[in-house]
Amino acid sequence: MGSMAAAAEAAQEEETVVFRSKLPDIEIPSHLTLQAYCFEKLPEVAARPCLIDGQTGAVYSYGEVEELSRRAAAGLRRLGVGKGDVVMSLLRNCPEFAFTFLGAARLGAATTTANPFYTPHEIHRQASAAGARVIVTEACAVEKVRGFAADRGIPVVAVDGDFDGCVGFGEAMLDASIEPLDADEEVHPDDVVALPYSSGTTGLPKGVMLTHRSLVTSVAQQVDGENPNLYFRREDVVLCLLPLFHIYSLNSVLLAGLRAGSAIVIMRKFDLGALVDLTRRHGVTVAPFVPPIVVEIAKSPRVTADDLASIRMVMSGAAPMGKDLQDAFMAKIPNAVLGQGYGMTEAGPVLAMCLAFAKEPFEVKSGSCGTVVRNAELKIVDPDTGATLGRNQSGEICIRGEQIMKGYLNDPESTKNTIDKGGWLHTGDIGYVDDDDEIFIVDRLKEIIKYKGFQVPPAELEALLITHPDIKDAAVVPMIDEIAGEVPVAFIVRIEGSAISENEIKQFVAKEVVFYKRLNKVFFADSIPKSPSGKILRKDLRAKLAAGIPTNDNTQLKS
């Protein structure tokens, strides 16, 4: 029986319709550690600008960044960090983010990245789950972690000031008395180097274990080869505006820029005037954006085509972009190629990328999110039967390759539910591949709400809501929003006799979560629709929204 089952499985694998990049596979040096890979061409670029701090104007050459990462590694080791440990980076974009990440990598440690504007509860939960040994943060988050860290004996390093109970970044990491790390620790390509948190297709945030091999492969899939899919040149100036605590920016901006030898201009936060100023001053040529930034540029009368004339490439990820928006935006950036990518944290994160970005570009279609990256396989499966589908048939997108995650930290069950026995990562996204190998996303199986590219897990908000004494049951689903893409809205069942209002519920949630997880609207219902197994029927609730629901505080839905 066992041999028959194996034969049947092998036959099914042979019948699988697999899609690959139009670009040929390349040799990827996945035996290298991430830092060795990024600095492999250091002798050629040592004197070139590497990181430019948009706020202070400080410029760090490639040679300086490499040395400072060694110094940061020595500083982290002095704070007790060793191979297999975890460093929490609780920072907005800044040079210290790069020094810390690369320094931890040299020690064989992993970095778990988090948004400094998270609430204390959100930060503490991630730091505890990840097992952080050191927290590197900035002024806006010091108060959120100081007590938590002191209780657990975790050193806190502050990059931008002197605070009681913290050590300064310069003193801890960059002091001249600290000898830079001479030799990196013995690191295996399958050791974890990045530990971002993602909700995957469902549930609460989970630690995504990305290894040195994962990230080397993912970056190489983008920028390596004679005809790279993402053609970064050494003379390029890449804008690093999207938050580095998000894996897309860490991978496709910082690490890809380092590998290519480009200059990287770091912005701490989005400000349209500052963006224009930095673009003019430094001659920015590559600008990775998300659609909300594209919307603001497209609609702002303050931005002219002259302001952004140096930009030759605009990478848009995290959410789909319609043709009307593209046209309005391109009028402001007439010299640029605009294209989209498609990613998922668990996939390393890039699954697909626009081939108009290649050194030898291809014609691409509007609305496509690109073609699967090279050295990887993609298939479309029927979400109900698991059967493989062909071209122009919509189903769940699955990806396989060395770039995908090792698994979820301490969560084998969720790992098993996401990566099947054949090594295919199931994205929870519904899409199809057309006759030209271009991928189109049409729907989402997974529950995650995408607010301006940020993940909002419904389960997290639901768990919070039902802790309120006036709330009997709750469900959270996305509602379409022109600016944000999606916003979270809640369906609430009040306990008998309660008169709790929409505003009271919104305020209750706002105190506990980061700004982008706050509820946009609250609707009251007699009950939450659920399957026999108790699973919330989110499609039913989304259908109610699509049908149009009155939005006053007294809305009562009959289920």
UniProtKB/Swiss-Prot annotation:
Changing residue 395 to R: In ral1; reduced lignin content and increased accumulation of 4-coumarate and ferulate in roots; confers increased tolerance to aluminum. (E)-4-coumaroyl-AMP binds at residues 248, 252, 318, 340-341, 345, 353, 446, 450. ATP binds at residues 198-202, 206, 340-341, 345, 429, 444, 535. Keywords: ATP-binding, Cytoplasm, Ligase, Magnesium, Nucleotide-binding, Phenylpropanoid metabolism. It is found in: Cytoplasm. It comes from the Eukaryota. Its main location: cytoplasm. Residues 341-408 are annotated as: SBD2. Expressed in roots, stems, leaf blades and leaf sheaths. It is an enzyme of class 6 (ligase). SUPFAM superfamilies: Acetyl-CoA synthetase-like. CoA binds at residues 269, 452-453. GO terms for biological process: lignin biosynthetic process; phenylpropanoid metabolic process; response to aluminum ion. Both substrate-binding domains (SBD1 and SBD2) are involved in the substrate recognition, and are sufficient to confer the substrate specificity. This is 4-coumarate--CoA ligase 4.
